[in-house]
Amino acid sequence: MAHGVHKMNENEYTAAGKDAADSPAIPGHNCDGCVNYALCHPESHKKNGGSSVDGPQEENNMTVVMLADGFEEIEALTPVDVLRRAGLTVRTAGVGGRVITGSHGISVACDMTEDEVRAEDVDLLLLPGGMPGAKNLDASPAVDRLIREVNARGGRLAAICAAPFILGRRGLLSGKNATCYPGFEGELTGAHLSALPVVTDGNITTAKGMGVALDFALELVRVLLPGDASKKIADSVQKQ
């Protein structure tokens, strides 16, 4: 359910004996388990870098979304939004620079470049589709290194639309159930092709395309967090 926001002023917080940064914007609202922390605790959310439910997350415990020119905007930014709602630390990394332009002309100022990402800091490496974005990711030596190193250390990989072909070309889908945008199946070397829109097999999640970007993002919350965080977010955004 969406909240109507009344932000208490400093005097109200003080009278309640609470620190302003850690008190809810909605009087009487129980924030335990709340998925919309940015709304309920806007000051603390901002203080913690805009991504943490229980305080700042460690930088070595994060999701990195790789962006290259020509990326599909909804496939990339829906997971950023949803994972941050779940309290996870998410960073965007640009291939070839910090400002990356999507396939529909939307530019994103990334948090870092691909050369600044350390595989040991990454729990989940996410590859959006879109053309020529997916081809540009595939051609990046830094992205290749990150994919191999994150996978080798047991981290998670996720790819949507055309991007699963990047994993397929590296032999990482062999023996796994996987899906992709129609027409790229031949690139998923050794995979068991699934008709499902979103598939998780082991440490790899794949999805068909932009139309299932929200389902893809919610599945990533499910595999990263225990409990019902994914369901709570789905309910809060009116997912049918």
Indicate residue ranges for each PLM-predicted region:
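Cysteine-centered metal-binding/redox modules
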Residues: 2-56
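Short, thiol/selenol-centered motifs that function as redox-active sites or metal-ligating centers
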Residues: 34, 160-161
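Extended, subdomain-level signal for the structured scaffold at the beginning of enzyme domains
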Residues: 54-157, 165-169, 175, 187-195, ...
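Anionic-ligand binding patches
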Residues: 178
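Cytochrome P450 catalytic-domain "roof"
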Residues: 200
